[in-house]
């Protein structure tokens, strides 16, 4: 097996008590093995009791001792100090590497105490064997056998072997198919360095096919960084990626609910989000389908239910109501999209009636959305996905007879700006766009409360840029038609740009 040489540098020491006993400064319980027994005496700790109860020992400081003394040494082959019986195998390990795992360290110390009537003398022999003065002497400490029982089904022999290999080598490659098993092994071993590395790799490798397993692992091991990473990734990619891939059906309902409630959720429009959610429900009920269905197939499926009861009022749909209550149906204003809502037989009649009433009042009052107050939870959302090939990108949107262009510009490799501006209906690229919305507002000014957000992923972390929540009157002249501009610097691609706004009473 392998073993590293001892580091020559000595840790700084400080005298403890009236005798020649010492500890490391600023450490309540030193991990320097040469002073471990003396430390217990100086701090009035029953050393043999502490040895029999390894939880009292500060394993992290013992780990620090080995790290400081062995980190710059080449690993050599040598006789193993410990035999680990686990998963039907016997694994040969060495003390300096073993102490990186809190679980193995505690098992080792417990076995050391149980295997002799003089545990203090036994440990002192071990400490002398680790002394820099004894590097050429063979360790007098006997081989100790420890056992570890693992019941976690995620832990495979290959994954566990990879985890143990990481005790000796810091940059062992972890295959994607073994990643969950290595994470589980690191959790059981209490090998914090490897566990964190697995979490970082998982966050970097999030995609529609992996998010379910990674999110469930984060929940299982109570790893908030991983679950939060999954939530943030899905907030940006639910509509752009999830809505186009068969893996959408794997997304757990609780994760989906969190994402739908988030003000960071990116969508091209409220109707795009609705279509994504209808597809998710369709895939839950038709889980044997192997290819993404067409939009027409999904619509036909829901229209096939008897008209006497909408889908969300049926037993099969009631549990999904919390998800669809998160949707902003009031933000669906295009005539043909409203027709889809009405004839889909998916939503309760009371929901659709409220949408109709809100639209009627807004149209009667020149677009004023008097029923909307909070920009974070009620605003109408539109989005741009700015990719590598884009130098300029824009979309025209319409709301209650007002037309806006949302636009993004790339100035150089890392500089971008985003804004929106009001345009005249006569400036639309196609006259059919006017007829599509059925009406045009002739008001000279429109008060708008809005916010522009942009997010990009850089080195596994999300960069977020945003304007303040701004109230502004948009006119039709050059000086009054343009919003504030969001200017950003980022190397991340793609950039997810969200425009959220409300028409307050004016």
UniProtKB/Swiss-Prot annotation:
InterPro entries: BTB_BTBDG, BTBD16, BTBD16_C, SKP1/BTB/POZ_sf
Chain segments annotated as coiled-coil in the UniProt record: none
Span of domain BTB: 150-206
SUPFAM superfamilies: POZ domain
Pfam name, any one: BTB_BTBDG
Protein name (database record): BTB/POZ domain-containing protein 16
Native source organism of the sequence: Homo sapiens
Lineage, highest ranks first: Eukaryota, Metazoa, Chordata, Craniata, Vertebrata
